[in-house]
Amino acid sequence: KNIINKEKASHILVTHSHLDHSPLAIRMSRDFSIPIFAHGKLEMARSSIMKKLLNSNLDIGGFEGLDANFRPDYYLNDHQVINGFNWSIEVVHTPGHLADHLCFSVIEKNILFSGDIVMGWTSTLISPPDGDVGQYFNSLDKLLNRSDNVYLPGHGLQVEDAKKYVAKLKKHRIERENQILSILKIKPHNSYQIADKIYKNQPQPIIYAGSRNVFAHLINLLERNVICCHGLISPDNHFEFINK
């Protein structure tokens, strides 16, 4: 409170509508009469495959930690510039972790607030229907084409040499995809069975989170016609590699 009063805060910028990011914005806005800026259009930002899965009423799980009632005062668009007293911030739409995820680039400083799309301590959770591997790869490529060289993430320490770090995250996801494919080439598995093999000897919460990432990869591979699903698309059903 003392910091906000001293610095005369004028904008509340929210990276995405997860419960560990957006709820405090409502309280701060009320207590200090500061407007909230965010993407705010989660349903519209979902990828076409995720919209299709949701419209099919399939049991795909997900929605972990979603702040479903979050609404900003102002809705932001990709590449929009927000101007303050002595600063300007570019909005960078980066879906993948969550469809409404934004990064904020401080133009004068070449610094990017990267939210959860790039965290300082591990790769991010991608949990369908709001997490999407295809969108995630596109967002990483988008960041690689930018000039921001320092990231301030929502979790973890400041990221120096940001492009190198983002390239490392992309490489990790490609390696994970190859792991999944190598398992499916042996025989069909569901997402939980694959996660058990990849994250073996890890605590159960880690394996479950890993299974959501695996399921996101499976949906992406399915969309690309690399694999097929036995029955309806679900983390419980088996996926099989397609020999071409």
Label every model-predicted segment.
Residues 2-83:
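Active-site HxH/HxHxD metal-binding segment of metal-dependent hydrolases
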Residues 33-39, 113-115, 206:
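Short hydrophobic/aromatic-enriched beta-strand-loop microsegments
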Residues 182-244:
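C-terminal regulatory/interaction regions
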